[in-house]
Amino acid sequence: VNREQISTLAHADHPIAAPLDDDSVRRLLERGIPRDGARVLDLGCGGGEWLLRALAAHPQLRAEGVDISESALARARSAARTLGLQERLVLHQEDAADFAAPHLFDLVISVGATHAFGGLLATLETARKHLAPGGRVLVGDGFWSQEPSPDAVEMLGDLADLPTTVDRVISGGWTPVHGHISTSRELDDYEWAWTGSLASWALDHPDDPDSSQALAAATTHRTEWLSVYRDAFGFVCLILRPTSD
């Protein structure tokens, strides 16, 4: 079982694939989408859950998603057909950092995908290229809510605390106009869903050759979360506008 398969199984019960509950997602989209007929782009869209929810809430909205994963985009297409949204959704299989479109977008989303661009500020610079005048970016990334252990830093990378994270964004030429800091409940719910969905699949498929590896991956992830980074990791979503166009 490869990394992508594990991620698919782990997010089966939490398709937004970030530590946010449904109300938080809805509020962020309401704040980020300027009007019903807007164009929305998701860079690193995975299964397209952000776009599907935006399309369902805004009947005139048009959306595009970019992801490297063929299987994730297939899930997005299938879900769009089931919901009757396929006519307003365009999906592109390519590296999101290299994506080019013939038009600009009113909202660019990239939540939990900054690693694909080389970090938060690099993600924002990529998003800036796609923004229409007056457009907004909805970005989500991790931060340290308290001093991390060396093991946590090794595991999750060179994050900053929340004030420093926001200061860096502002220094990069962006102004926050809204945001959401994931609650401890949202963070815990996400991790329980991740580990629980993967473990349940393994237990439900004992004869599958990947079952034991999937169960081991769930156990390892749960241990790392509870023992290494649970008390230090936070997640923030920011809605940003360019400070100057």
Question: Where are the model-predicted features located?
Answer:
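Conserved alpha-helix/loop element of class I SAM-dependent methyltransferases that forms part
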Residues: A18-D36
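A short SAM/SAH-binding and catalytic strip from SAM-dependent methyltransferases
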Residues: L107-L120
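A short glycine-rich, Lys/Arg-flanked "PGG" loop and its adjoining helix->strand segment in the class I
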Residues: L121-R136
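Short, glycine-/aromatic-enriched active-site segment of Class I SAM-dependent methyltransferases
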Residues: V139-D158
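Class I SAM-dependent methyltransferase SAM/SAH-binding core
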Residues: E49-A97
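Conserved Class I S-adenosyl-L-methionine
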Residues: H180-D245
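A short acidic, Gly/Pro-enriched loop at the edge of an enzyme's catalytic core
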Residues: A97-V108
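Conserved class I S-adenosyl-L-methionine
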Residues: G37-G46
